UniProtKB/Swiss-Prot annotation:
Identification of the protein by name: Ornithine aminotransferase
Cofactor: pyridoxal 5'-phosphate
Gene Ontology MF, one: identical protein binding
GO-annotated biological processes: arginine catabolic process to glutamate; arginine catabolic process to proline via ornithine; L-proline biosynthetic process
Role noted for this protein: Catalyzes the transamination of alpha-ketoglutarate with ornithine or N-acetylornithine and of glutamate-5-semialdehyde with glutamate and alanine.
Modified-residue entries (N6-(pyridoxal phosphate)lysine), positions: 262
Xref: InterPro entries: Aminotrans_3, Aminotrans_3_PPA_site, Class-III_PLP-dep_AT, Orn_aminotrans, PyrdxlP-dep_Trfase, PyrdxlP-dep_Trfase_major, PyrdxlP-dep_Trfase_small
Post-translational modification: The disulfide bond between Cys-154 and Cys-163 is reduced by TRX1 which increases OAT catalytic activity.
Subunit structure: Homodimer.
Native source organism of the sequence: Plasmodium yoelii yoelii
Similarity field: Belongs to the class-III pyridoxal-phosphate-dependent aminotransferase family.
Amino acid sequence: MEFVKDLKTPEDYINNELKYGAHNYDPIPVVLKRAKGVFVYDVNDKRYYDFLSAYSSVNQGHCHPNILNAMINQAKNLTICSRAFFSVPLGICERYLTNLLGYDKVLMMNTGAEANETAYKLCRKWGYEVKKIPENMAKIVVCKNNFSGRTLGCISASTTKKCTSNFGPFAPQFSKVPYDDLEALEEELKDPNVCAFIVEPIQGEAGVIVPSDNYLQGVYDICKKYNVLFVADEVQTGLGRTGKLLCVHHYNVKPDVILLGKALSGGHYPISAVLANDDIMLVIKPGEHGSTYGGNPLAASICVEALNVLINEKLCENAEKLGGPFLENLKRELKDSKIVRDVRGKGLLCAIEFKNELVNVLDICLKLKENGLITRDVHDKTIRLTPPLCITKEQLDECTEIIVKTVKFFDERF
């Protein structure tokens, strides 16, 4: 393109983005131009292991040929027609998703934030029409340190100052309880105006916080006791990331509502979904909720193939098989580190928490980049380790060496 012929070096691309784009992100200084499988490549063609996976969007690996072909083939025929009409791909996608996960209905949207916003509306409406909560009194309970997006509804449910500072006033009737605290949850759910409890099975953005083994079963039981909808936000934890198709499957519970996003397209297109049974989903009537792009034919075709890849290539099983040894190897190699506070995770949703009073975690990310692996810090103290689920044992062993080598580089300062 003639108008960008001045862009040649990584610095040129970085400065161009900073000049013309809003400063709502603070990226690691690497300029990526292509990707394949578990690898991304910068403008100088240096290869990196991707250990962020677009926040678990590319569970199937970057640019998977089957998903890409499904996308191209559908784009040649029909990309969008709006929900004013029926389309062939949408019904197929809806049937596949509901049968796969065991729910009556699915409502397709575009982003994880939209899935959460949809859940807020769905649960409130169910609260008024089924639970008979007085008008405008419906309350939704969420966990402290959750992350569901940055729309106004989502930040109304947030306790993260960076998300909420100077963005008020907020949507009312969100109550926050500590994560992994059943006693606090039960106390809150005694309020008859509570319609729903929305929870991440593992808190991702909080730093990969894994709850007690009995937590989600306890959540299920308490929600049933007080006639409150149990909503599992599986946008980040779902679709194989933790070693099961859904993270809640580890705990043998079935929430009333499931929220999905990210890997629903394998990173090729924004797709999200809300799943529930008829007694919940059908409180929403025509015209009461929707999206121009939600459930478009292109998204539906991509979604079906992304799920096919996940299942046919046994990526859930791969995450479960490799995740445990990966975590144990890191714990063993880093147990004597002066700067590591904790190593934790489930499947291939893992993290290392550092003693941020001793080390700048951003510096660790930059050193990892130098050593051929990219990821990002969370809350200035934790780095996320979430490779695509197609990673092999040999590749994961190499990445373990990179991570250990990087941590030991900083350990040598003490």
